């Protein structure tokens, strides 16, 4: 007996490379979210990104203020913290796109 229709994805968000992420954020309706610390954000970030530190105690409260009807494109330094943030937001019903290589990969790619 087959169990077709039960092929859930292992994650509720998409993880993409730099080129795909650049295409996603070219849409001005997409919210760009940097989940690094304020200090890291101040040292450089993707243009137009807002900063909500995923490790802060108020991440869930602040992230809940994001518009629920818009895609959230998020990143951290290298792709670890962003997975945590993406899972939290996806569980809250947001459509989330995560940059696999983080800001380091973004800058290495010359973006």
Residues covered by each model-derived region:
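Rhodanese-like catalytic fold shared by cysteine-dependent sulfurtransferases
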Residues: 1-24, 30, 39-71, 77-111
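Structural scaffold elements adjacent to functional motifs in cytosolic proteins
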Residues: 32-34
């Amino acid at each position: 007996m087959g169990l077709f229709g039960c092929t859930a994805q292992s994650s509720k968000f998409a993880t993409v490379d730099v080129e795909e992420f650049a295409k996603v954020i070219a849409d001005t309706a997409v919210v760009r979210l940097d989940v690094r610390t304020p200090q890291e954000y101040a040292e450089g970030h993707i243009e137009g990104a807002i900063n909500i530190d995923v490790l802060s105690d108020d991440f869930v409260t602040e992230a809940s203020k994001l518009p629920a009807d818009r895609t959230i494109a998020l990143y951290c330094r290298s792709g670890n913290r962003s997975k945590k943030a993406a899972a939290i937001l996806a569980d809250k019903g947001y459509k989330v796109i995560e940059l696999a290589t983080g800001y380091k990969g973004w800058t290495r790619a010359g973006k």
